């Protein structure tokens, strides 16, 4: 799988993300989760990742991308009718959502939808909704290069170095 942002070059024991609930996830944990995802779902699948504002959500988004699959990143509390509309339009092969306190999956479950698999562009890294409030089913498509460029822009703007800690 693609080692986006050189995650494999970080100390696997170093904390990659932590949240206000005290959950800490290491770089090694994210890579292990990506391997778990990669070995358990069809390659280049569309995965709706319904996230809460927590470390588990960050880990799942990263793991789905690192495993070579494409997440549509949505708020876990997206209105039911909007979510159903998005599922009808985009027909994801999997849906990941917060459901369990399982420490191996950081409080999220991944379930197959049984929608047929279809070809996704090889450059597509992830999808984001254009707006959470209008109910529009339109999505913004992002490429792998966009992630690297955004990370570089952010690190340049804030003059971040590898010695800086995000928390």
Predicted features along the sequence, with ranges:
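A short N-terminal helical cap/helix-turn-helix that marks the beginning
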Residues: 1-15, 125
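Conserved S/T- and glycine-rich ATP-binding loop of Class I adenylate-forming
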Residues: 47, 64, 130-133, 166
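Conserved AMP-binding/adenylate-forming
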Residues: 23, 36-77
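Conserved AMP-binding/adenylate-forming core of the ANL superfamily
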Residues: 10-41, 83-84, 142-145
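Conserved pre-ATP/AMP-binding loop-to-beta segment of ANL
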Residues: 12, 112-129, 136, 159-166
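Conserved AMP-binding A3 loop
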Residues: 26, 125-152
């Amino acid at each position: 799988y693609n080692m986006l942002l050189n995650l494999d070059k970080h100390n696997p024991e170093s904390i990659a993300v932590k949240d206000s609930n005290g959950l800490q996830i290491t770089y090694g944990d994210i890579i292990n989760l990506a391997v778990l995802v990669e070995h358990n779902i069809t390659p280049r699948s569309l995965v709706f990742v319904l996230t809460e504002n927590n470390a588990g959500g960050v880990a799942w988004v990263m793991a789905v991308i690192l495993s070579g699959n494409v997440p549509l990143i949505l708020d876990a509390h997206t209105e039911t009718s909007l979510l159903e509309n998005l599922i009808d339009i985009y027909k994801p092969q999997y849906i990941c959502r917060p459901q369990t306190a399982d420490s191996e999956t950081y409080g999220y479950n991944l379930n197959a939808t049984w929608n047929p698999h279809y070809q996704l562009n090889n450059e597509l890294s992830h999808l984001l909704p254009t707006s959470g409030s209008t109910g529009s089913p339109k999505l913004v498509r992002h490429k792998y290069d966009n992630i690297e460029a955004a990370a570089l822009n952010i690190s340049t703007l804030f003059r971040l170095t590898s010695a800086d800690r995000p928390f």
